[in-house]
Amino acid sequence: MQNKIQGVYLVTDRPLCLHHKLEEVVQMAASGGVSLVQLREKDSTSREFLELAIHLKFILSPFQVPLLINDRVDLCLASGADGVHLGQTDLPWLEARRILGKDAIIGLSIETKEDFATLTKEDPNPQLEYLAVSPVFDTPTKTNTKEALGLAGVRWLKEKTDIPVVAIGGINISNAKDVIGAGADMIAVVSAICSAKNPKEATVALRNQF
């Protein structure tokens, strides 16, 4: 599944969907060529989240775009999603792999050099589909992260691992090319697509930065 880890990665945020419903944003992003979608709705109840995940999986299926679930391995299983994105305080990735199986897409946030050192100490060859440099730039969509790692952080992680590198945090059309140039295999965005008047065109524009 690592060949899917390239291009544009949409991370959802309903309050930032200023011009369209979230489901419409996801469909337009898929038609614009988004490679991966992560459902990340922290304020939803488990029932709401599950219903939305099932709906998004249905929307994305014709486009063959995988759907990942933020944090919740149980809701990934229940919804039939393709995998999970895990933060440093979530379920350990090895447990997620044991539960979800070898074919699931599992990505892990790397917020500090210490995070990477701990990961590779536990397993020198972690079976993860991607590592996410988070955040690259300061971003209002996620306030519980460490200090921004910048382009230097992207370069550093790319040099350290053969696992595909996803860059997330404050990425938009004005800086995407620099992030890709620093070594990101995939750029993850929130407001750059969710808040766009035309999410399809926004997705195409970001894809064209590669």
Swiss-Prot record:
Mg(2+) binds at residues 71, 90. 2-[(2R,5Z)-2-carboxy-4-methylthiazol-5(2H)-ylidene]ethyl phosphate binds at residues 139-141, 170, 190-191. It comes from Leptospira biflexa serovar Patoc (strain Patoc 1 / ATCC 23582 / Paris). The keyword Transferase applies. 4-amino-2-methyl-5-(diphosphooxymethyl)pyrimidine binds at residues 38-42, 70, 109, 142. Binds 1 Mg(2+) ion per subunit. It is an enzyme of class 2 (transferase). GO terms for biological process: thiamine biosynthetic process; thiamine diphosphate biosynthetic process. The gene is thiE. PANTHER family: THIAMINE BIOSYNTHETIC BIFUNCTIONAL ENZYME (PTHR20857:SF23), THIAMINE-PHOSPHATE PYROPHOSPHORYLASE (PTHR20857). Belongs to the thiamine-phosphate synthase family. It catalyses: 2-[(2R,5Z)-2-carboxy-4-methylthiazol-5(2H)-ylidene]ethyl phosphate + 4-amino-2-methyl-5-(diphosphooxymethyl)pyrimidine + 2 H(+) = thiamine phosphate + CO2 + diphosphate; 2-(2-carboxy-4-methylthiazol-5-yl)ethyl phosphate + 4-amino-2-methyl-5-(diphosphooxymethyl)pyrimidine + 2 H(+) = thiamine phosphate + CO2 + diphosphate; 4-methyl-5-(2-phosphooxyethyl)-thiazole + 4-amino-2-methyl-5-(diphosphooxymethyl)pyrimidine + H(+) = thiamine phosphate + diphosphate. One of its GO terms (molecular function) is thiamine-phosphate diphosphorylase activity. Condenses 4-methyl-5-(beta-hydroxyethyl)thiazole monophosphate (THZ-P) and 2-methyl-4-amino-5-hydroxymethyl pyrimidine pyrophosphate (HMP-PP) to form thiamine monophosphate (TMP). Pathway: Cofactor biosynthesis; thiamine diphosphate biosynthesis; thiamine phosphate from 4-amino-2-methyl-5-diphosphomethylpyrimidine and 4-methyl-5-(2-phosphoethyl)-thiazole: step 1/1. Keywords: Magnesium, Metal-binding, Thiamine biosynthesis, Transferase. One of its GO terms (cellular component) is cytoplasm. This is Thiamine-phosphate synthase. The keyword Transferase applies.
